[in-house]
Each structure stands twice: as structure tokens, then as C-alpha cells.
Swiss-Prot record:
Organism: Idiomarina loihiensis (strain ATCC BAA-735 / DSM 15497 / L2-TR)
GO molecular function per UniProt: NADP binding; shikimate 3-dehydrogenase (NADP+) activity
InterPro entries per the UniProt record, alphabetical: Aminoacid_DH-like_N_sf, NAD(P)-bd_dom_sf, SDH_C, Shikimate_DH, Shikimate_DH-bd_N, Shikimate_DH_fam, Shikm_DH/Glu-tRNA_Rdtase
Claim: Ribosomal protein is one of the keywords in the record: no
Any one cellular-component term (Gene Ontology): cytosol
Binding site for NADP(+): D80, G129, A130, G131, G132, S133, N153, R154, T155, A156, K157, K158, L221, G245
Function: Involved in the biosynthesis of the chorismate, which leads to the biosynthesis of aromatic amino acids. Catalyzes the reversible NADPH linked reduction of 3-dehydroshikimate (DHSA) to yield shikimate (SA).
Gene responsible for this protein: aroE
GO biological process, one term: aromatic amino acid family biosynthetic process
Domain of life where this protein originates: Bacteria
Disulfide bonds: none
Positions bound to shikimate: S17, L18, S19, T64, N89, D105, Y223
Keyword presence, Metal-binding: no
NCBIfam families the record matches: aroE, PRK00258.1-2
Protein name: Shikimate dehydrogenase (NADP(+))
Length: 279
């Protein structure tokens, strides 16, 4: 009989998290035995809660909002992609009390974009937001060699800092990322729009670029039972292929699960179908 692997997710809020069900389904497909729990915390208590979790036998944890960037400062070692992102969504214990911080968000997004037939290479992208979520996906998007990536953030200084960090790391040429404080300032047709802000959580509409390509597509990292406000905006603007971040959620979770449990990647198609079926 397999021993039970203790896993969890830290966030605030956290009661809504689908991670326990997703990982339970992964375990079902691989016949693993896991115990995956939600952990509510605050920024002040987050380091202690994480330390307690692993001290009491935790074997892996996810980190969600608002702790992804804080988690990057807690770990002993960062993976290359987590270092590039400046944010961590996966904690992996190794050695005596040591923690590796990784970030599977970008990988999850790229896999889901490919599943949906959305190509990034040589395309013009507009990414809304410059926070932890954007940091997690932009390095992986850049690896796909888009023609140009517009980073849209109300606080242009924050976006410029992110661009500068990426340039310093040698990940992007100076002309590959263009910063705009509003999408209205973009003066070329955009092929793919990605919302990495929390605007959809409060029903906030974003200003879209004035020019969209004929086959423009859109992706909201947020997800809900109904189309998000951002998705509705894009549909109204004529985008043909519009998706929420549910597929990314499943794919990044599968990457985390594989890091903890080893062996093959879980069957995400099965989990996606099960999660979309009303319980």
C-alpha cells in the first residue's frame, strides 16, 4: 500500500480554490494516495505557515495570490523560470529543511494555448498587467519568439521595471517588449490579447487596443462558470477564439504534480472533462 503524500495550497482567499479536486483527480489517474488541503494565511504569517507545513511532513505545496512573489524570497533555491518570473507557485522540499521554488504558470499557459491552436511565434501580443501573474507567463511567452509583446499596465513604471529586469537577464532584446500605460496607445494590429490582471474578478472592463488583426484571439488567466468580462469584451470586438484560464489552471497543476510525484505527467484531458462536468 502506498504511503499518503501530504500536499497543499496557500492563498488568501483560498476557500474557492479548485486545486484539491484537481490534484485528487490526478492521483486517481495514477493511483497515487495524497492528502491535499487548502491553507489560508496572511502576508505576516505566510512564512511561518509554510515552515510549519513542511516541518510537519508536507511534501509539496502550491502558492497562489497574493503570496507568489513573497514565496520567492522564502526558498533556499529558485528554478531558472521562477527566478525570471520573480514569483513562485510551487514549493518542493529537498534535503534537510531546504525548499526549491518553481513556477509552472508559464508552462501551463503555453501548453493550453497550443491545445487551443493559438500560436505565439511571430505574433503581436498584448499582455495586460505587470504583477506576479504576468511575471509568471511573460518569460515563457518570450521563449516562443513573438514578433512583439506589448506590456500594458496603468503604472508604466512598474512595467518598465519588469522589462528592464528581463533585458538584464538577457531574455529579451530591447525592442521585443514595448510598454504602454493604456492599450489605446498601441498603434499596430494585435494577434493575441492576454489578461494577466484581476480585472475580471470585480467585473472591470479593460481598454482594448484600437486595432485587432483579422484572426485576433484572446485569453483571460481568470476563469469562471460564465465568460469573464474580458472574454465578453473580446467577443464583442470580433475575436474568434476566446478562452478563460481554466485550461492553464489544469496544465500548471499537472506540471506541479509531476515535480512532486515524478514519473509521467498526469492525464489532463481526463481531469479537464471531469472538472467541467457539474458535480
Amino acid at each position: 500500500m502506498k504511503s499518503v503524500t501530504s500536499l497543499g495550497v496557500f492563498g488568501n482567499p483560498i476557500a474557492h480554490s479548485l486545486s484539491p479536486r484537481i490534484h485528487a483527480l490526478f492521483a486517481q489517474t495514477r493511483q497515487d494516495s495524497i492528502n491535499y488541503q487548502r491553507y489560508l494565511s496572511t502576508p505576516g504569517h505566510f512564512p511561518r505557515r509554510v515552515a510549519e507545513f513542511f516541518r510537519h511532513g508536507g511534501q509539496g505545496a502550491n502558492v497562489t495570490l497574493p503570496f507568489k512573489q513573497q514565496a520567492a524570497s522564502l526558498v533556499t533555491k529558485l528554478s531558472d523560470r521562477a527566478r525570471l518570473a520573480g514569483a513562485v507557485n510551487t514549493l518542493i522540499p529537498y534535503g534537510n529543511g531546504l525548499l526549491l521554488g518553481d513556477n509552472t504558470d508559464g508552462e501551463g499557459l503555453i501548453i493550453d494555448l497550443k491545445n487551443k491552436g493559438l500560436n505565439v511565434s511571430e505574433r503581436s501580443l498584448a499582455v495586460f498587467g505587470a504583477g506576479g501573474s504576468a511575471r509568471g507567463i511573460i518569460p515563457l511567452l518570450l521563449e516562443q519568439k513573438p514578433r512583439c509583446l506589448y506590456l500594458v499596465n496603468r503604472t508604466a513604471k512598474k512595467a518598465e521595471m519588469l522589462k528592464s529586469q528581463l533585458e538584464t537577464l538577457g531574455l529579451v532584446a530591447a525592442n521585443r517588449i514595448q510598454v504602454r500605460s493604456s492599450a489605446s496607445e498601441i498603434d499596430e494590429p494585435i494577434d493575441l490579447l492576454i489578461n494577466a490582471t484581476s480585472s475580471s474578478l470585480n467585473g472591470q472592463r479593460l481598454t482594448l487596443p484600437p486595432l485587432l488583426s483579422e484572426n485576433a484571439s484572446g485569453y483571460d488567466l481568470m476563469y469562471a462558470d460564465q465568460p469573464t468580462v474580458f472574454m465578453e469584451q473580446l467577443t464583442q470586438a470580433g475575436c474568434k477564439n476566446v478562452s478563460d484560464g481554466f485550461g492553464m489552471l489544469i496544465e500548471q497543476a499537472a506540471s506541479s504534480y509531476q515535480l512532486w510525484m515524478g514519473d509521467e505527467r498526469p492525464d489532463t484531458a481526463f481531469v479537464m472533462a471531469e472538472m467541467r462536468t457539474p458535480s
